Amino acid sequence: MFLLLRFLLPLLFLTQLVCADEMSSNKAKSIQAIKELGSSLKSSVQMAMKESGSIGALEYCNVVALDITKKLSESLKLTVSRTSLKTRNKKNIPDDWEQKSLSVFTAQHIAGEEIKNMYFHEIVTTNNNDRIYRFIKPIPMGKVCLTCHGSNISADLAHKIKELYPDDKAV
């Protein structure tokens, strides 16, 4: 179960004001945003890993990951973020809707469904009676991610993780 939860890191959700008949259009936009964010984060971390090693990449990710996500949100005019049942950064703690969705993904994965086929989306009504479109999809972790999120982390890297993320639950 612990390995499964690590495999589901990170996850994304998007919100945008919509009408019910715009579901497929918003789904396509959401999937594209996820691809862009995943690609951008992966290439940035790989570059930092090559230039500065795992500790340098962790420090880079600590500073840049939220900025990359914010810039993508602004450029696409969507709210894009990452979350997980086991967050590293407390700014990424899931809300109730996300937590429920993540729990469903975990159960689906245990039942044998492939992560690449999982997603959930719906239009929800907020406390302000606004209707928003929400989309969440797990992103399987690649090899580079396991350097900091895997089970075989060096003592130096573990110390740096604890220093940068004192409330870390992602390891």
Language-model features, listed with the residues they occupy:
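Sec-dependent signal peptide recognition
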Residues: 2-11
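Hydrophobic h-region of N-terminal signal peptides that target proteins for export
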Residues: 11-19
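Extracytoplasmic c-type cytochrome modules immediately beyond a signal peptide or single-pass transmembrane anchor
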Residues: 20-141, 156-171
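The canonical Cys-X-X-Cys-His
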Residues: 142-152
